[in-house]
Regions:
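Anion-binding (especially nucleotide phosphate/pyrophosphate-binding) glycine-rich loop
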Residues: 463-588
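Phosphate-binding loop of NTP-binding sites
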Residues: 6-11, 31-37, 52, 65-66, ...
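Nucleotide phosphate-binding/pyrophosphate-handling subdomain across enzymes
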Residues: 3-16, 24, 28-31, 35, ...
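A gly/ser-rich beta-alpha-beta helix-loop segment of oxidoreductase catalytic cores
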Residues: 113-118, 564-608, 677
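Structural signature of FAD isoalloxazine-binding scaffolds in flavoprotein oxidoreductases
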Residues: 488, 495-500, 527-546, 593-623, ...
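C-terminal helical cap/extension that packs against the catalytic core
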Residues: 374-434
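Phosphate/pyrophosphate- and phosphate-bearing ligand-binding catalytic cores of soluble enzymes
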Residues: 475, 526, 613-730, 734-758
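NAD(P)-binding Rossmann-fold cofactor-contacting core
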Residues: 37-50
């Protein structure tokens, strides 16, 4: 359906953006809002909060019903023709436009300043927009990342200029007619579209052929860019010393505040310019933006003010954390040249080590530049590789992270491979050293990991400072080491207190700061989700919280005391009645919270009193009679923390106790699987034990992924190797659905499920 471009300025339209959270669609949403249009959008990832706050109706996920009563539907080239919403728009006869078409239509009413290049477009376009803003030009801008100093990634201003980065990844946008253009470089990129470097140069030549006014192009150091601009008449060059460019920069240095360089413009000394950016490559970007602004009549002093006001665009060497213990930097680098330039900028920060966390973007790009990526990454002190962000591409055998890791190793680099984001966090927690710089790079969702690591480190550092050596504090401790089923992502902060006083300090801090606090015992009857446990995870593994003493026919024990050890001490002191605990693979604290049982006996039958800490860090001794005790649950101990208890038994001879233990051991080995498990997975139903029900349903030996219902006991799910929490949960759902359908029984989980999904 045809669409008159003038309609964008002739009253409100209802516009739906497919993929609104993308870096090319979010600025378009902001521009359309500025023009007074009603905007809705959908995406498979969350949209920036700022556009939702401005009124964009956002839907997470895409469906035919996701398009309401709208006039226009817009999608980027990344959205395939078979996208369900794109197809629905066609079915309904709605106006359908690609993002580049809309940008071209909007640009007709402005003087378009196009920023071009394989790298550096967002940073440079942001610099130019900032210069024009400070010069009072009230420009419109369209940027590939959020500009903090401008408060948006897209804006429709009242001035004549539209500053836009123009992406060549979709081919030469012939519908654009720039008034002026800035070409930063023309490296071989987007290998899924262009066969070779000549094809890339040809695309830029086509774009530059449509430019009405000056073309600012980087000088000799970028020969491909000069080739692309070879036939341009109004060509103005910029570059560093010895390039003989029209705008000649001289590097003056870099410090914590940014970079400084001097400029001579067409033989005239323009003075020194400073910009809050890192690295010589960003100095080149600033020099190019300066040249464009100067050629379009912006005074040097206004340019200087604009560059001083500039703040890095989102994900362009964005420093998320900077403190002596750790610096975390997030960057969009996804081409070997970008990786190299970003590493050089990181090196200039003067940290102890650089740990590069890299997520390759597209298999085609990795396959084409495998060796170049390895050479750039091997310069880091340590490389952690994430799975390839496919961006819709199919996997290419022989061109994955395993091959990249091997090449880095051949070059002498140290490398670790993470199979997932949670595994990467586990690796980072293991390798972190005081003074490190964590450099996250990639064009995919690695940015979410970078932001999480930056946030989580603050919690880790705060807890470590609170503890003051009275216990163990670890960052990103893998929970599969601490659960009997050997499953679970990392704990954000793992804390083993040595004393009640240290525990109380952390408990009070968590309550004040709103940080989740989870207490885990020996990890039986516990399933930790694959994303791990957020906040602080407390484990009573230190001697100060796991003491066991026998006195007057009773046992006083800390919450961290292993049940097996409690039984051993009881036996040595002639205390009978605790033998059932010997086979429960847990600690006292967890056993009390769950009222764990075995051999027809229950933990709270042996409890005389419990020492508890509330969430304000206050400790009190509570008698057994003051607790409500339920099947597999003691409600008060879900909130309050059991830090110890007094247990009672009856007098018994050691040989009698030993015989009882042998009987229980034989029974347990005959009826329970030896493979890693969380113990009984479901509570018994009112009329039938869960294990027997599962057996009668014919579900023994059923598996999902690496999780399997034990052939020995139907109420045990075992980890047969490499199982994930999601496998166990899906298998549990399968059992519950079958029990409900065939028997009308709702099976309630006995296992406690904690944490967040991957």
């Amino acid at each position: 359906m045809s669409f008159d471009a003038a309609r964008w300025n002739q009253g409100k339209l209802r516009v739906h953006l497919i993929g609104v959270a993308g870096s090319g669609m979010t600025p378009l949403a902001e521009i359309l809002l500025d023009l007074g249009h009603e905007v809705t959008g959908s995406d498979l990832k969350p949209a920036p909060a700022r556009i939702i706050q401005r009124g964009v109706g956002f839907s997470l996920g895409q469906a035919a019903g996701g398009i309401g009563p709208v006039d226009v539907v817009v999608a980027s080239a990344a959205i395939p023709d078979e996208n369900v919403e794109w197809m629905e728009a066609k079915k309904r006869g709605l106006v359908r436009l690609r993002r580049a078409e809309v940008l071209g239509q909007l640009a007709r009413g402005k003087k378009l300043l196009a920023v071009l290049g394989s790298h550096g477009k967002t940073t440079t376009a942001t610099m130019v927009a900032q210069i024009f803003h400070e010069a009072g030009e009230n420009p419109s801008f369209y940027l590939g990342g959020y500009a903090p100093a401008l408060g948006a990634s897209g804006r429709w201003g009242k001035g004549d200029w539209l500053i836009a980065e123009v992406d060549e990844s979709e081919g030469a946008p012939t519908q654009l007619k720039p008034w002026a253009a800035l070409l930063l470089n023309a490296d071989y990129e987007h290998v899924d579209r262009y066969a070779n470097e000549k094809a890339v140069i040809a695309a830029y030549q086509q774009i530059l052929g449509n430019v009405a006014g000056p073309v600012i192009v980087v000088a000799k150091e970028e020969t491909a860019a000069m080739d692309a601009a070879g036939s341009v008449k109004q060509k103005v060059t910029f570059g560093w010393e010895k390039s003989e460019a029209d705008y000649l920069g001289s590097w003056e240095g870099e410090n914590a505040e940014g970079i400084r360089f001097g400029v001579k413009g067409k033989g005239k000394d323009l003075g020194t310019f400073a910009v809050a950016a890192t690295g010589r490559h960003n100095g080149g970007n600033a020099l190019g933006g300066l040249a464009m602004a100067a050629e379009l009549g912006i005074a040097p002093e206004k340019i200087r003010q604009g560059l001083q006001a500039f703040r890095r665009a989102e994900r362009r060497f964005e420093i998320l954390v900077s403190e002596p213990a750790l610096e975390v930097v997030d960057d969009y680098a996804h081409h070997p040249k970008e990786v190299m330039a970003t590493w050089k900028a990181a090196q200039a920060r003067g940290r102890e080590r650089i740990v590069a966390i890299f997520q390759p973007h597209r298999y085609t790009r990795l396959a084409t530049f495998m060796t170049a990526f390895a050479e750039a990454l091997a310069k880091a002190d340590l490389v952690v590789l994430l799975p390839v962000y496919a961006a819709g591409e199919r996997e290419m055998e022989g061109f994955g992270v395993a091959e990249l890791a091997a090449k880095i190793g051949e070059l002498g680099g140290k490398v670790e491979v993470a199979g997932s984001m949670p595994e990467c966090r586990t690796i980072l927690g293991k390798v972190w050293q005081e003074g490190d710089l964590f450099l996250f790079m990639g064009a995919g969702d690695v940015t979410q990991l970078a932001k999480k690591v930056a946030r989580d480190f603050g919690t880790f550092r705060a807890v470590r400072d609170l503890v003051k050596g009275e216990g163990v504090v670890k960052w990103y401790e893998p929970m599969n080491k601490h659960t009997t089923i050997r499953i679970g992502g990392p704990a954000q902060v793992w804390f083993e207190p040595e004393s009640e006083e240290a525990l109380g300090r952390v408990v009070r801090w968590c309550g004040k700061e709103g940080v989740p606090l989870t207490v885990v015992g020996r990890g039986s009857n516990l399933l930790v989700r694959d994303g791990g446990i957020g906040g602080v995870c407390v484990h009573f593994g230190q001697p100060g919280m796991s003491k066991i003493e026998a006195e007057g026919g009773k046992i006083r024990a800390g919450a961290g005391a292993r049940l097996k050890q409690i039984v051993s001490v009881a036996k040595a002191n002639g205390i009978m009645g605790l033998e059932f605990m010997e086979g429960i693979p847990g600690a006292l604290g967890g056993a009390m919270r769950m009222n764990a049982g075995a051999m027809e006996s229950w933990t709270f039958e042996a409890v005389e009193s419990v020492r508890v800490m509330n969430r304000e860090g206050k400790v009190s001794e509570v008698a057994r009679g003051d607790f409500e005790v339920k099947y597999r649950k003691v409600p008060r101990l879900v909130e309050d923390i059991a830090v110890g208890a007094v247990l009672h038994g009856k007098p018994g001879k050691p040989e009698e106790i030993a015989e009882k233990l042998k009987q229980y051991s034989r029974k347990r080995w005959d009826s329970q699987p030896a493979a890693p498990s969380a113990g009984c997975i479901f509570k018994n139903a009112e009329k039938i034990p869960a294990g027997r029900l599962i057996e009668e349903l014919g579900l023994k030996d059923t598996s999902v992924g690496g999780a399997r219902i034990s052939p020995v006991h139907g109420n045990f799910i075992v980890n047969q190797g490499g199982a994930k929490a999601v496998d166990v949960l899906r298998l549990m759902e399968k059992v519950q659905a079958r029990a409900r359908k065939d028997r009308g029984i709702d099976l309630e989980p006995e296992v406690i499920v904690v944490g967040e999904d991957e």
